[in-house]
Amino acid sequence: MTKQKVAILGPGSWGTALSQVLNDNGHDVRLWGNIPDQIEEINTKHTNRHYFKDIVLDKNITATLDLGQALSDVDAVLFVVPTKVTRLVARQVAAILDHKVVVMHASKGLEPETHERLSTILEEEIPAHFRSEVVVVSGPSHAEETIVRDITLITAASKDIEAAKYVQSLFSNHYFRLYTNTDVIGVETAGALKNIIAVGAGALHGLGYGDNAKAAVITRGLAEITRLGVKLGADPLTYSGLSGVGDLIVTGTSVHSRNWRAGAALGRGEKLEDIERNMGMVIEGIATTKVAYEIAQDLGVYMPITTAIYKSIYEGADIKESILGMMSNEFRSENEWH
């Protein structure tokens, strides 16, 4: 692939890690953010120490506070901003874009107010004549590992397979590999909903439960993610892939996962507001729990783990009692899909 110009919107941990992947591939990378000290640090010290204390970025990776500068003459735009501001940033991008670009996102969540997937938001806010079909970049990927060039395999999903193949070529190298998929619904719901299950798995750890319990919540969590996804129109096979079970494993078992760490802290009895303040990063699984619970209620989808986490976070229920309460639920077949 010839050298491409890519704007990455959101210089958080994942946006920064992906900027390095693209830079390693010889592309021109521009990070955009709205925190002056962070932008200055990236440009002058070539570090982003809030997320990576010991990593020095290549000097070719630049950052700017000016969205117009970031978008000038780019071939592709990657959204890696928190779910709750995706629509706002997309509107700002739409007001500036003056040429067609490949639009990608690598965030994992559902919009709280509308319950919409992020690709839908981008499609609504950015005119079709200025963008490709949206490409979703998702899968089992800790930024802490990608930034040190550990082997990582993820998915590029789009309704337009050629757009997905473009992104596959853009990112893939000797340590970072993408597989294409056309099931955007499946990939996005898997990426968003696994954060809820990671909170549950972390809570079990914080409560002192062992591997049996954690394996159970991850496995049954995959079942309820799949139930809801299929109801929304996803291909069930997607949940057996990198963006499904792969992402669920990496997020539901690792201390690198902010959702797992948040769940562990909840299990230890810490207050949510203290957890969010101490972590200093967005915990997408908290907001997604509410959205998923509301969707499940509307569609009549059985999601006991999501319900237990929802009641603990939003209704003040004791998290241990909520989780143990699932042990007395109605007997079911393992393969029920409703």
Curated annotation (Swiss-Prot):
<dbReference type="GO" id="GO:0046168">
    <property type="term" value="P:glycerol-3-phosphate catabolic process"/>
</dbReference>
<dbReference type="GO" id="GO:0005829">
    <property type="term" value="C:cytosol"/>
</dbReference>
<feature type="binding site">
    <location>
        <position position="194"/>
    </location>
    <ligand>
        <name>sn-glycerol 3-phosphate</name>
    </ligand>
</feature>
<feature type="binding site">
    <location>
        <position position="284"/>
    </location>
    <ligand>
        <name>NADPH</name>
    </ligand>
</feature>
<feature type="binding site">
    <location>
        <position position="258"/>
    </location>
    <ligand>
        <name>NADPH</name>
    </ligand>
</feature>
<dbReference type="InterPro" id="IPR036291">
    <property type="entry name" value="NAD(P)-bd_dom_sf"/>
</dbReference>
<dbReference type="GO" id="GO:0005975">
    <property type="term" value="P:carbohydrate metabolic process"/>
</dbReference>
<feature type="binding site">
    <location>
        <position position="13"/>
    </location>
    <ligand>
        <name>NADPH</name>
    </ligand>
</feature>
<dbReference type="GO" id="GO:0046167">
    <property type="term" value="P:glycerol-3-phosphate biosynthetic process"/>
</dbReference>
<feature type="binding site">
    <location>
        <position position="14"/>
    </location>
    <ligand>
        <name>NADPH</name>
    </ligand>
</feature>
<feature type="binding site">
    <location>
        <position position="259"/>
    </location>
    <ligand>
        <name>sn-glycerol 3-phosphate</name>
    </ligand>
</feature>
<keyword id="KW-0560">Oxidoreductase</keyword>
<feature type="binding site">
    <location>
        <position position="247"/>
    </location>
    <ligand>
        <name>sn-glycerol 3-phosphate</name>
    </ligand>
</feature>
<dbReference type="GO" id="GO:0008654">
    <property type="term" value="P:phospholipid biosynthetic process"/>
</dbReference>
<feature type="binding site">
    <location>
        <position position="139"/>
    </location>
    <ligand>
        <name>sn-glycerol 3-phosphate</name>
    </ligand>
</feature>
<feature type="binding site">
    <location>
        <position position="108"/>
    </location>
    <ligand>
        <name>NADPH</name>
    </ligand>
</feature>
<keyword id="KW-1208">Phospholipid metabolism</keyword>
<dbReference type="Pfam" id="PF01210">
    <property type="entry name" value="NAD_Gly3P_dh_N"/>
</dbReference>
<keyword id="KW-0594">Phospholipid biosynthesis</keyword>
<keyword id="KW-0963">Cytoplasm</keyword>
<comment type="similarity">
    <text>Belongs to the NAD-dependent glycerol-3-phosphate dehydrogenase family.</text>
</comment>
<dbReference type="Pfam" id="PF07479">
    <property type="entry name" value="NAD_Gly3P_dh_C"/>
</dbReference>
<feature type="active site" description="Proton acceptor">
    <location>
        <position position="194"/>
    </location>
</feature>
<comment type="function">
    <text>Catalyzes the reduction of the glycolytic intermediate dihydroxyacetone phosphate (DHAP) to sn-glycerol 3-phosphate (G3P), the key precursor for phospholipid synthesis.</text>
</comment>
<protein>
    <recommendedName>
        <fullName>Glycerol-3-phosphate dehydrogenase [NAD(P)+]</fullName>
        <ecNumber>1.1.1.94</ecNumber>
    </recommendedName>
</protein>
<feature type="binding site">
    <location>
        <position position="141"/>
    </location>
    <ligand>
        <name>sn-glycerol 3-phosphate</name>
    </ligand>
</feature>
<feature type="binding site">
    <location>
        <position position="143"/>
    </location>
    <ligand>
        <name>NADPH</name>
    </ligand>
</feature>
<feature type="binding site">
    <location>
        <position position="257"/>
    </location>
    <ligand>
        <name>sn-glycerol 3-phosphate</name>
    </ligand>
</feature>
<dbReference type="GO" id="GO:0047952">
    <property type="term" value="F:glycerol-3-phosphate dehydrogenase [NAD(P)+] activity"/>
</dbReference>
<keyword id="KW-0520">NAD</keyword>
<dbReference type="InterPro" id="IPR013328">
    <property type="entry name" value="6PGD_dom2"/>
</dbReference>
<feature type="binding site">
    <location>
        <position position="258"/>
    </location>
    <ligand>
        <name>sn-glycerol 3-phosphate</name>
    </ligand>
</feature>
<dbReference type="InterPro" id="IPR006168">
    <property type="entry name" value="G3P_DH_NAD-dep"/>
</dbReference>
<keyword id="KW-0547">Nucleotide-binding</keyword>
<dbReference type="GO" id="GO:0051287">
    <property type="term" value="F:NAD binding"/>
</dbReference>
<feature type="binding site">
    <location>
        <position position="282"/>
    </location>
    <ligand>
        <name>NADPH</name>
    </ligand>
</feature>
<dbReference type="GO" id="GO:0006650">
    <property type="term" value="P:glycerophospholipid metabolic process"/>
</dbReference>
<keyword id="KW-0444">Lipid biosynthesis</keyword>
<feature type="binding site">
    <location>
        <position position="108"/>
    </location>
    <ligand>
        <name>sn-glycerol 3-phosphate</name>
    </ligand>
</feature>
<keyword id="KW-0521">NADP</keyword>
<keyword id="KW-0443">Lipid metabolism</keyword>
<dbReference type="InterPro" id="IPR008927">
    <property type="entry name" value="6-PGluconate_DH-like_C_sf"/>
</dbReference>
